[in-house]
Each structure stands twice: as C-alpha cells, then as structure tokens.
C-alpha cells in the first residue's frame, strides 16, 4: 500500500469556548518530514488548533486525519499511539523529578520510532550534563529541550510545538532551530505555533496565517520571506 501523502490532514476544523467560536472551518496539511507554522496574533486560535489536533479540546467539529486514517474520535492517548506528540508552551516539566526521571516517566507509545535515552543525550548533551538536576532547575531553553526530548523518546513522529522560542535568548532560539531542522531531516514532522516570524522563517517549509480563527493566508517559505512585512502589517503583529 502506498504511503499517505500527508502525515496530518485537518479538514473543516471549528472549535468553541462556550458560545465563543475560536476556530472557523480550518483546513491544513503537514507532510512527512515537513515543518509547518501557524502564525498570528494572540487570540487568533493557534493554540486551540494544536489542542484540537491532539484531542485535548473536545468542543470541536471537523476531522483530523493521521496517515490517511480519521482520528477525530480518538482520545489524546490514542492519538499519541498514532505518533502525535504535544509540547505545550508551559513545557510541562515535573518539578519533583530529575531531568532523567522526566525523560523516562512518559510511556513509550510507538516503540518503532522511539528515541533511546542514549539518542536523546547524543542530540541534547546538556541534558546528560544535567541528568540529576530537578527538572525545574533548568534554564528556560534547557526546559524546552527537555520537553521536546521527552516527546521524541515516547516515539512521536509529528510534534505539535507551542511557542518553543518564547522568552528564550537568541542563542538558545538558534539551538532550538537546529534541533528542529535535525529531526526534520530524520523524517519527523512538526506543526509549530510561533510569533517569532524571523525564527519561523529559518525552520519552516510552509506557513499558515491565522486571524480570528481562520486561515487567511497559506504560503511557502520563499513567499513568506518576500512578503513578510506586508503580512505582519495585515495581521497587526
């Protein structure tokens, strides 16, 4: 059987908070080994979209298709077994556990694609150096690396990253970009929420611009770079 064209396909996704509609009929795709960003102002619906794809936001309609199979009715654990990995903007680090315990705690959901602890330490050497530190003793950038590494160790092949560069020093943002490009080269897909458009342009293949819960522009990276100022003015960013 031929491999599905898209790792992820979202069709007609709408979502609500009570009576307030947060997403309006969103369509998007993420290919195998592709990095796609969601760009927009605060409140545009970017995080709600990630949460809906992961199955964490239940007040949603439309379909989420993973590797050609409709996953819309699956709970978050079942979607994780299909290869989805969620990295929230608060990183979700367990304060009472060491770095290594944080890495080992989540279950391996896809053994065939799970990174070993040695693979994690090879790609994230700072985590080996800090293995016995409490997770929340790490810097913001180190915590972001830990959150990403933990999801890769579980076997995720499509990462949902929410604002990975937020609040980080430029040199750390550069390192996060290097990691994203490395896992992309290994075939991992990424759907990335990001307001740092300079960073987004260094890692992404395509971009979806969101405003008031709608995708208002979809562009490849070359067009995004060429029209950057115009687009940011349009979005009020």
Functional labels for PLM-detected ranges:
Residues 18, 59, 74, 99-117, ...:
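ABC-type ATPase nucleotide-binding domains, specifically the catalytic core motifs of the NBD
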Residues 39-41:
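The feature captures the beta-strand-to-loop junction immediately N-terminal to the Walker
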Residues 54:
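Helix-to-loop junction immediately C-terminal to a conserved catalytic motif
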Residues 63-80, 221-224:
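ABC ATPase NBD Q-loop/coupling interface
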Residues 134-138, 142:
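Conserved ABC ATPase signature
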Residues 152-157:
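A short, proline-enriched helix->beta-strand linker immediately N-terminal to the Walker B motif
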Residues 159-163:
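Catalytic Walker B motif of ABC-type/P-loop ATPase nucleotide-binding domains
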């Amino acid at each position: 059987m031929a491999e599905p064209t898209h790792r992820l396909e979202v069709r007609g996704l709408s979502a609500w908070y009570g009576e307030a509609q947060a997403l309006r009929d969103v369509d998007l795709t993420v290919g195998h080994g592709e990095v796609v960003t969601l760009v927009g102002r605060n409140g545009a619906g970017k995080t709600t979209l990630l949460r809906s794809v992961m199955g964490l936001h239940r007040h949603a309609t439309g379909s989420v298709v993973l590797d050609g199979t409709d996953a819309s009715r699956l709970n978050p654990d079942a979607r994780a077994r299909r290869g989805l990995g969620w990295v929230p903007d608060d990183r979700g680090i367990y304060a009472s556990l060491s770095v290594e315990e944080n890495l080992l705690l989540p279950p391996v959901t896809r053994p065939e694609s799970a990174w070993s602890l040695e693979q994690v330490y090879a790609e994230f050497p700072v985590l080996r150096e800090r293995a016995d530190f409490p997770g929340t003793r790490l810097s913001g950038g180190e915590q972001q690396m830990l959150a990403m590494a933990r999801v890769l160790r579980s076997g995720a092949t499509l990462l949902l990253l929410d604002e990975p560069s937020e609040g980080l020093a430029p040199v750390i943002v550069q390192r996060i970009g290097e990691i994203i490009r490395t896992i992309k080269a290994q075939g991992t897909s990424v759907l990335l929420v990001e307001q740092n458009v300079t960073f987004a342009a260094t890692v992404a293949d395509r971009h979806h611009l969101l405003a008031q819960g709608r995708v208002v522009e979809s562009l490849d990276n070359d067009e995004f770079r060429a029209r950057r100022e115009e687009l940011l003015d349009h979005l009020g960013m």
